[in-house]
Design a protein with these regions (language model features):
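Bacterial Sec-dependent signal peptides at the C-terminal "C-region" and cleavage site
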Residues: 8-23
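Short, surface-exposed beta-strand/beta-hairpin micro-motifs centered on an aromatic residue
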Residues: 83-91
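A short, amphipathic beta-strand motif
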Residues: 25-33, 39, 149
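Structured interaction patches on ligand/partner-binding surfaces of diverse proteins
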Residues: 105-152
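Sec-dependent signal peptide recognition
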Residues: 1-9
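Short, ordered, surface-exposed loop/turn motifs in non-cytosolic proteins
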Residues: 34-75, 94, 163-164, 171-172
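A short tyrosine-centered beta-strand micro-motif
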Residues: 93-101
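Short beta-strand segments within Ig-like beta-sandwich modules, predominantly Fibronectin type-III
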Residues: 78-82
Length: 172
């Protein structure tokens, strides 16, 4: 029933875009990533700088839930995908929101990533990371721009999950 009402509201707002835009503020920013040297033949300074350079993350999904922290049963109120330059934007009514990435939408992340011979998981860190999301924002009477995020690629672990540490052997 809840899902039906959510779809009904979304359909109404989509059918009347001028009404939906009224009273909203635009939230926008850029998402970037940079790499790390992960062993093997030592790179030249030029190659190392190239690896560590910030690059836009295209296709990165940002989800929005109402409230100041992520809750499992909270509904997603908006989402957006970064463009080829890593830019994203969405329109929100005044209020408090938490921004999330895909891995923070449900608690499967705790089953997906468990400690192993080569990965160490900080469970307290994972709980806090899941709860806090990417960030929380308060939307008032003005738009929020330059809400930027940067991910440093660490060796042999997923890019955007900060609570994992590689403890295995590095390539010679």
């Amino acid at each position: 029933m809840n899902v039906f009402l959510t779809y009904l509201i979304i359909a109404f707002l989509a059918s009347n875009p001028t009404e939906a835009k009224k009273g909203t503020q635009t939230i926008s920013g850029t998402i970037t990533a940079s790499g790390s040297y992960c062993g093997g033949v030592a790179p030249s300074n030029e190659m190392l700088q190239e690896t560590q350079a910030k690059r836009p993350m295209s296709g990165f999904m940002v989800y929005v839930k109402k409230g100041t922290e992520n809750k499992l049963l909270s509904c997603i109120v908006d989402s957006t995908c970064t463009d080829s330059k890593g830019n994203y934007s969405f329109d929100l009514r005044p209020g408090k929101y938490v921004l999330l990435q895909k891995e923070q939408l449900n608690k499967n992340i705790f089953e997906t990533y468990k400690s192993s011979k080569s990965i160490q998981v900080d469970h307290d860190c994972m709980q806090l990371w899941w709860k806090k999301g990417l960030t929380s924002i308060t939307v008032g009477n003005e738009s929020i721009d330059s809400l930027n995020f940067h991910f440093q690629k660490r060796c042999f672990v997923p890019l955007s999950i900060p609570c994992l540490r590689y403890i295995g052997h590095y390539p010679p």
